[in-house]
Amino acid sequence: MPQATRWPDIVFASDWRLATLSEATKAGRLRRIARGIYTPSEDPVEAVVRRNWMQLLGRAFPGAVIVDRSTRAGSPDSSGCLYVDHARRRALALPGLVIVPRSGPGPLSGDQALHGFYVSSTARGLLDNLAGGGGRCLSREEIEAWITEIATRHGEPRLNALRDQAREIAAAAGREDAFTRLSTIISAALSTGTVDAVVSHALQASAAGNPYDHERLALFTTAAAYLADQAPASLPDLPDLASRRRLFPFYEAYFSNSIEGTEFTLDEAASIIFDAAIPAERPEDAHDVLGTYRVVADPVEMARAPGSADDLIELLKRRHAIIMEGRPDKSPGRFKTRANRAGATVFVAPRLVEGTLRAGFDVGRSLLDPFARAVFVMFLVAEVHPFADGNGRVARVMMNAELAAAHEGRIVIPTVYRGEYLSATKAATHNAVFAPIAAVLAFAQRYAAQVNFETRATAERDLARTNALVDPQTAEDNNIHLLLPASLDRVGMA
């Protein structure tokens, strides 16, 4: 008995005997897609064509170069359209795929060879699109967005290399005029061009000397929109709570450092803050706690919320200088000069820090609710990560200053609540989901309002009975959660 033929996902008639194809088609083992093209798959024809577009392109347009607007993705767009440079004049229309050719110089230096075809280099793609050509080319706004993305992700060296490569191929591509336009746009992206040479807000900001991370700004815009849609969450810091809050700054500083891994016992932290007893074996960690306390214990300082982007920059630098005074190697009060990251999260590039803070502040200034502003500024600072170290601490200081300035209750994140806080922050960073961080901070604010901070004894009684000091991993392993003091009081009265 003859062995059954094992057909590839896409079958070209030129590779097989006509009789074999005819028999398989009649028997229902193959379906005809178009002239000379078959498939054994029972999937929708459009799906078969889309997943085999590379083979189809290489066969129908051998040596073609993907060009024009198709260069950006290097593949067909959502409608299935793919633009190529090839000598063939007629388009190929298949279910789910339309390949549209135009004449051109063919492959150039820098183009990437794939399965019988080429993909234009980024430099060539930009030149082709800037040359124009109706619907087959990107708009000026789309081109500038592409360049902005390159600048954000790869920085100045990549832009300069891109311009050099474009200069080398411009004549061969017949794109000398397009190169002039590209060079002007890149100059704006490098803050060496003029504002009126570009149309996008991101590149205009770059040209004006305030380049920003446009992807982060989109994230901040989403955050502000979410927070603006929430009902106001007022929790006033009433005057009759003043005595209960005498020691609040101590615990605020303690827990803010604990989140960052600076671990002391409460007695050790009290000696550092109230007795200036700096442990010889951990002077830098001790100064972190002391510096944070100096900021949050100053009622005048904590009553200041930024009213402008200039205020934001000034407050950030001054507060950071105080918090990180004990770590001169971390450049207290000065923005970072090297890129930083945490795990898979890469923060805003140094050259984009100030511009991103300014643009982000402008996005958030429309928020009216103090709690919403507090959440927003905390996320803004944490996401930009403007300093070499101390970013989380200064972000939470900025958060609580927004609340203090509006006479609202401030927030502490107890040790046991660290996991929830960090998970919620990651959800905002990676998924643009802001409900968790708003909920976590709202609960932490309610918690802080219910703890009796009048004396260390009263405060630490509440901290102990609410699980505040439990190690986060121990809490997770044993299903231990942060409890509200009021909920325990109600149980005790029952």
Regions of interest found by a model, annotated:
Residues M1-I33, S41-W53, G58-R59, G63-D389, ...:
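FIC/Doc superfamily catalytic core
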Residues Y38:
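Short helix-loop capping/hinge segments that flank enzyme active sites or metal/cofactor-binding pockets
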